[in-house]
């Protein structure tokens, strides 16, 4: 049985491809998700995707993943800098996760430099554009342990 990966995108990432393309590029979220699903399958893994602009919905999806996925790739968007609640949900389910950002948040406004997730993430991918999603999915598929099937 291959690994099961959950890809979560936070607020405004539904606007990928149209929102500030000079920062985020012109690839849409639908294109990113399709590419990541195909890449996961080529590695023998499965990928589920989820996007929400609402903190509570993201928390609910993380909690629903408990016992069902081997790893999470999360681009928390602006919640990176504000959400202790999403951090607590990730820690509460005990699923290893990769934190991902399309842009180099450390080269942007100073308030974007702090993350509530980085110190607990298994890895952080920053500034590689949408290619970072493929890197994250590949890392989870090849390096994370499969959950125990009881």
UniProtKB/Swiss-Prot annotation:
Keyword Endoplasmic reticulum among record annotations: no
A Pfam entry, by short name: DHquinase_II
CDD domains per record: DHQase_II
GO molecular function (one): 3-dehydroquinate dehydratase activity
InterPro entries attached to this UniProt entry: DHquinase_II, DHquinase_II_CS, DHquinase_II_sf
Assembly information from the UniProt record: Homododecamer. Adopts a ring-like structure, composed of an arrangement of two hexameric rings stacked on top of one another.
This protein's name: Catabolic 3-dehydroquinase 1
């Amino acid at each position: 049985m291959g690994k099961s990966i959950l890809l979560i995108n936070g607020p405004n990432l539904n606007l990928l491809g149209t929102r500030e393309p000079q920062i985020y590029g012109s690839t849409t979220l639908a294109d990113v998700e399709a590419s990541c699903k195909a890449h996961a399958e080529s590695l023998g893994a499965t990928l589920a995707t989820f996007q929400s602009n609402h903190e509570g919905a993201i928390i609910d999806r993380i909690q629903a993943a408990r016992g069902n996925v081997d790893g999470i790739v999360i681009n928390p968007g602006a919640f990176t800098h504000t959400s202790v609640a999403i951090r607590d949900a990730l820690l509460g389910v005990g699923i290893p996760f990769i934190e991902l950002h399309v842009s180099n948040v450390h080269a942007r406004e100073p308030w974007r430099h702090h993350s509530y997730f980085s110190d607990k993430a298994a890895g952080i991918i920053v500034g590689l554009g949408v290619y970072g999603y493929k890197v994250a999915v590949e890392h989870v598929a090849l390096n994370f342990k499969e959950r125990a099937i009881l």
